[in-house]
């Protein structure tokens, strides 16, 4: 282990790395069930769903193992959120345009992912992606971590537990707080929300308990604070389901199959590239889609690597991460593997930050998570019972910690402050790391040009900004 991962050199141990790997896996285990749901339009139990489920586990493991041994970094990969939703939308449009079934359209769009992965492999081998990283201004790089932190908190508070999501005029605590006249009392909200009210209350309370447990343990120097906090939150949530909701949180385990559906994967997704339908969608559309996938994936990955590495102290004084080329190459291999297995773009997950916060510093963290993905081919029903409240407590805590990176931003320099501020707004709102970086890059370039300092901006920075402008306003 020492010879492969250099544990002592990185100030860590086997125990710490394994706990960090488990922590990262638990915070992103939701992707195992959610990815096939999104890519198949929730066609649960169908051959395509089973194939995508296995593809998710296998492709995530392959990409993460490559990251572990090639880059020796504690980053974990899986099919990217946002990218998978975009994939599903495109597949649906292709099915309608070509008047074909969804599975055939799905296999046509897989060709786009394959081409994207091959392009990334070439860009990584020839150091072009590394040069793109260096073309991102220092101020923007310093703000990526805090912006990701806000996005993690937004996921934890909004998407996972819905603490401020509004629906039907009645909802969660944050919206009740704005009711200055007291009309929206708990009893009124309960009457309108029905059974969902108790579910919401249990989820929110459990999330905060998990968060406070993590904070208290972290203050005491417990390295497994995030993992323990998630376990405590899970137990409390399960107990609450039994006691207060009268439901069985483990009901999904009854009659569940623990055997991987390899036959369905071979029949529907494994190397199932439908190039005939791919060429039928038109060259302009195909190229536009490939460029869109490439840009989103590239800057999502770069942002995650830079932001998480900065939080872990893995960057130099200029904000650059050693072995960036190897990390980007691992990401490209993951995307190609994902396309071959039958899933959307595989990318580095922002949830890797939770493992880093738990002490993960080497590829052993990644290797641990990779083994868990492979194990989930057999224990997927078990992974699915991890409540959103437990995941949210970890995401919010890590997001808070990542905000500390703002102290490195020079607030006296508007060239840094304005792009960082816009990125802090854009990233959680859009839910895309790449879009946040794009807005920051465009604003940085515009400020430099109109302040008479255009020569301070590199040619590659201009090119990237122009590509983002095209992406936002020209490519549909």
Protein language model regions, located:
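Juxtamembrane transmembrane-helix boundary signature
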Residues: 59-81
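Transmembrane helix-loop junctions in multipass membrane proteins, especially transporters and channels
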Residues: 36, 40, 68, 72-76, ...
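Helix-coil boundary and interhelical linker segments in multi-pass alpha-helical membrane proteins
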Residues: 37-51, 91-108, 280-286, 387, ...
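Membrane-embedded alpha-helical modules
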Residues: 95, 102-232, 367-476
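Hydrophobic/aromatic residues within the transmembrane alpha-helices of Major Facilitator Superfamily
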Residues: 22-29, 62-65, 69, 153, ...
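Helix-loop-helix hairpins and the membrane-proximal interhelical loops
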Residues: 1-53, 192-194, 230-324, 468-470
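Helix-loop-helix junctions within the multi-pass membrane cores of secondary transporters/permeases
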Residues: 1-35, 59-60, 80-89, 93-145, ...
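Alpha-helical membrane-protein architecture signal
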Residues: 11, 15, 209, 287-291, ...
